[in-house]
Amino acid sequence: HRLPRSVWKEAQYIVKRIEGRAPKIWHPKDSEGRVDFHQNLWDVPLHEGDWCVMARTNKIASQYAQALRSEGWVYSRHGHPSVPLKTYEAIMDWELWSKGNTLPADKVRNLYTFMKPGTDYTRGFGPRSKFMLSLDSDAMIGISEAKEKLGLLLDGNMLWHRALTKIDLDTKNYILNALKRNDNVK
């Protein structure tokens, strides 16, 4: 029940032509939807609504994914979002944390996985250190407490793309481009 009826019909038409394919029974959503054919990815008005972009081969689909990424469009492929969930959560959590909110210990540990030891936090306070793993999972931690007790070396006023130094530059630029176009990064 993932696809609208018109898209489901097109998918059924395609898969019925695949020789040796095991039949799979599945049904469409109740909505009708619409199927449009475009010769080029850039002919698609991506800024209007949600799109399911299909390609004849995985190679073409990979090229489309790379093109979408280079332009800052958020997408999912094979059920995986183009911005990994843990990365997205770390960005959102840093934004909350830097505004003075407290975070549960597990979210602080996730933040530390995107920081570099020795420059962003004191060595020995890594996300898998005995000390971090011994924190009560219900404990709420603020940035000032993390600086005092968890070896945090970063300024709480830093933007996420400066603070989360383990996120590679390409991914940071991709996410920043998506945010500029007001795309939902999740």
Predicted segments, located by residue:
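The feature marks helicase ATPase cores and/or their adjacent C-terminal helical subdomains
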Residues: 1-186
